[in-house]
From Swiss-Prot:
It catalyses: ATP + H2O + 4 H(+)(in) = ADP + phosphate + 5 H(+)(out). F-type ATPases have 2 components, CF(1) - the catalytic core - and CF(0) - the membrane proton channel. CF(1) has five subunits: alpha(3), beta(3), gamma(1), delta(1), epsilon(1). CF(0) has three main subunits: a(1), b(2) and c(9-12). The alpha and beta chains form an alternating ring which encloses part of the gamma chain. CF(1) is attached to CF(0) by a central stalk formed by the gamma and epsilon chains, while a peripheral stalk is formed by the delta and b chains. HAMAP family: ATP_synth_beta_bact (MF_01347). It is found in: Cell inner membrane. ATP binds at residues 154-161. Produces ATP from ADP in the presence of a proton gradient across the membrane. The catalytic sites are hosted primarily by the beta subunits. It is a peripheral membrane protein. This is ATP synthase subunit beta. GO terms for molecular function: ATP binding; ATP hydrolysis activity; proton-transporting ATP synthase activity, rotational mechanism. One of its GO terms (cellular component) is plasma membrane. InterPro entries: AAA+_ATPase, ATP-synt_VA_C, ATP_synth_F1_bsu, ATPase_a/bsu_AS, ATPase_alpha/beta_chains, ATPase_F1/V1/A1_a/bsu_N, ATPase_F1/V1/A1_a/bsu_N_sf, ATPase_F1/V1/A1_a/bsu_nucl-bd. Belongs to the ATPase alpha/beta chains family. SMART domains: AAA.
Length: 476
C-alpha cells in the first residue's frame, strides 16, 4: 500500500465548488486536505465523500475557475492545518491559514489541524465562574460565564462592533487574555473596517506583533461555501491553542447563522436530502461539533460571543433555534435604547444569563439585579399612562419609581475605552463590587437628590456624585 501523504491523483470532474478526484490504489481519508495549483494560487480541497473505490468528492476552499480535468492533485495526508500562537495576533488569515493583510508571512509557533475532538469530560472544568467584563449592564444583569457561550443580538448600527471591541480591550487589560475574531460570511467592507478600527483603537498594532491582542480569521460573503463552513473552525483552532497555554480567551463569531447557511449550501452541493426549511439534515451535529469545542478546561477557558442573525425575525427558524440550545447568556441590543443616546444599548429586560443565580453570583448581586429589573419593568408598564395623561396623574410612589428608573437607565450607560476617539471622554472599567453597590444604593433611594444628568456616561456611583456636584455648581 502506498504511503498516505503526497499521493498524486487527477481531477475528473468540476461542478462549481465540488471537485471529484481520482486516486490509484489509495483513497485519502474523509476531511483530509488535498492540494492543487490554480494559476499562481494554492487551492485546498477537503474530502467530503468517497465515491466507489478510487474517487473522492471534495469541497473547494476557494474559487474553482481555471481548474481542468486531468490536473494533478496531491494528498497532504492530514486535515487543513492553520498557524497558531502569538504570531497570529494582529494578523488576518483566511480559512487555510494564509495571510490576507499584505503584511508578509505569519510567524507561527506551530500548525494545528482545524478538525479536533471536543475536550473529554475529565479535562473539562466544572466550576461555574463569571467573566468580569467591566461593562456594568453586562456584569450586573446578564453576566458571562467563563468558558460560556453568549449570543449577541442586534440590528445594524446599534453598537455590536463597539461592544465587541470593548470586550476584547477589557479582557486583554483585566485578564491578560487574547481574543480571536472569526468573520464568517459577513461583508468584506465590515471586515476591513474592523481591522482598521482595531488598529485605531489600540487593540492591535499594524502588521501584528508586540501589543496586538486579537487574531482575525476571515471567510467573507464572497468566499465559496466550503470556506465559510470551515472558517469558524479555523478561528476556533487558533483560540484552542491560546487556551491550552493557560489563557482565558475570547472567541468572537460574526455571524453564527452564516456558518449554518454555508453548511446548508455544502450539503445541497453534495446531494444530501434537505430537512426542515431546506437546511442540511446534519444541522444539529454540525453546530454541536463546533460548540462543544468551546469550553473551559483545566488549563484555560474559551468564552465565545456569537452574533446571531435571525432570518425574518423568526426565532423558531431551525438555524437560530439550534444556536439557542448552546447559549449560556444572551446580550440583546435595542435600537430604542441607542436612540436615547444610551450606550452600550443593551436591553436590561431582554438580556438573560444562566449565571444570574444566587448560588453562582451570590445573594447580594442577585437581589440587586432583580431590583433593577423590577424598577425598569414598572417604568415600562407606566409609560403608556405617562404618554396619554402625563406625569401629574401618577401617584407619588409611581413618580418616585419613574424618577429612579430614568436614573438607572442612564447609569447603565458608560464611556468605552475604544470609543474615546469619538466621545472625547476617557473609558471606564467598573469592578463588579462597585457596580452592585452603585445600583443597590440607587434603587434604594440614596441618590434621589441627584439630577438625572449626573448618572449619564459615568463609571462608578462616586463619579455620578462628583458630576452631580459639578452640575449644581454650574447651575448656581
Amino acid at each position: 500500500m502506498a504511503t498516505a501523504a503526497n499521493q498524486v491523483g487527477r481531477i475528473t470532474q468540476v461542478i462549481g465548488a465540488v471537485v471529484d478526484v481520482q486516486f490509484e490504489g489509495h483513497l485519502p481519508a474523509i476531511l483530509n486536505a488535498i492540494e492543487t495549483k490554480n494559476g499562481e494560487n494554492r487551492l485546498v480541497l477537503e474530502v467530503a465523500q468517497h465515491l466507489g473505490e478510487s474517487t473522492v468528492r471534495t469541497i473547494a476552499m476557494d474559487t474553482t475557475e481555471g481548474l481542468v480535468r486531468g490536473q494533478d492533485v496531491t494528498d497532504t495526508g492530514a486535515p487543513i492545518r492553520v498557524p497558531v500562537g502569538a504570531g497570529t495576533l494582529g494578523r488576518i488569515m483566511n480559512v487555510i491559514g494564509e495571510p490576507v493583510d499584505e503584511q508578509g508571512p505569519v510567524k507561527a509557533d506551530d500548525l494545528r489541524p482545524i478538525h479536533a475532538e471536543a475536550p473529554s469530560y475529565t479535562d473539562q472544568s466544572t466550576e461555574a465562574e463569571i467573566l468580569v467584563t467591566g461593562i456594568k449592564v453586562v456584569d450586573l444583569l446578564a453576566p458571562y460565564a467563563k468558558g460560556g457561550k453568549i449570543g449577541l443580538f442586534g440590528g445594524a448600527g446599534v453598537g455590536k462592533t463597539v461592544l465587541i471591541q470593548e470586550l476584547i480591550n477589557n479582557v486583554a487589560k483585566a485578564h491578560g487574555g487574547y481574543s480571536v475574531f472569526a468573520g464568517v460570511g459577513e461583508r468584506t467592507r465590515e471586515g476591513n473596517d474592523l481591522y482598521h478600527e482595531f488598529i485605531e483603537s489600540g487593540v492591535n498594532k499594524k502588521g501584528g506583533g508586540e501589543g496586538s491582542k486579537c487574531a482575525l480569521v476571515y471567510g467573507q460573503m464572497n468566499e465559496p461555501p466550503g470556506a465559510r463552513a470551515r472558517v469558524a473552525l479555523s478561528g476556533l483552532t487558533v483560540a484552542e491553542h491560546f487556551r491550552d497555554q493557560g489563557q482565558d480567551v475570547l472567541f468572537f463569531v460574526d455571524n453564527i447563522f452564516r456558518f449554518t447557511q454555508a453548511g446548508s449550501e455544502v450539503s445541497a452541493l453534495l446531494g444530501r436530502i434537505p430537512s426542515a426549511v431546506g437546511y442540511q439534515p446534519t444541522l444539529a451535529t454540525d453546530m454541536g461539533a463546533l460548540q462543544e469545542r468551546i469550553t473551559t478546561t483545566n488549563k484555560g477557558s474559551i468564552t465565545s460571543v456569537q452574533a446571531i442573525y435571525v432570518p425574518a425575525d423568526d426565532l423558531t427558524d431551525p438555524a437560530p433555534a439550534t444556536s439557542f440550545a448552546h447559549l449560556d447568556a444572551t446580550t440583546v441590543l435595542n435600537r430604542a435604547i441607542s436612540e436615547k443616546g444610551i450606550y452600550p444599548a443593551v436591553d436590561p429586560l431582554d438580556s438573560t444569563s444562566r449565571m444570574l443565580s444566587p448560588l453562582i453570583v451570590g445573594e447580594e448581586h442577585y437581589q440587586t439585579a432583580r431590583l433593577v429589573q423590577q424598577v425598569l419593568q414598572r417604568y415600562k408598564s407606566l409609560q403608556d399612562i405617562i404618554a396619554i395623561l402625563g406625569m401629574d396623574e401618577l401617584s407619588e410612589e409611581d413618580k418616585l419609581t419613574v424618577a429612579r428608573a430614568r436614573k438607572v437607565e442612564r447609569f447603565l450607560s458608560q464611556p468605552f475605552h475604544v470609543a474615546e476617539v469619538f466621545t472625547g471622554s476617557p473609558g471606564k472599567f467598573v469592578d463588579l463590587a462597585d457596580t452592585i453597590k452603585g445600583f443597590r444604593d440607587l434603587c434604594q433611594g440614596k441618590y434621589d437628590h441627584l439630577p438625572e444628568a449626573a448618572f449619564y456616561m459615568v463609571g462608578t456611583i462616586e463619579e455620578a456624585v462628583e458630576k452631580g456636584k459639578k452640575l449644581a455648581a454650574e447651575a448656581a
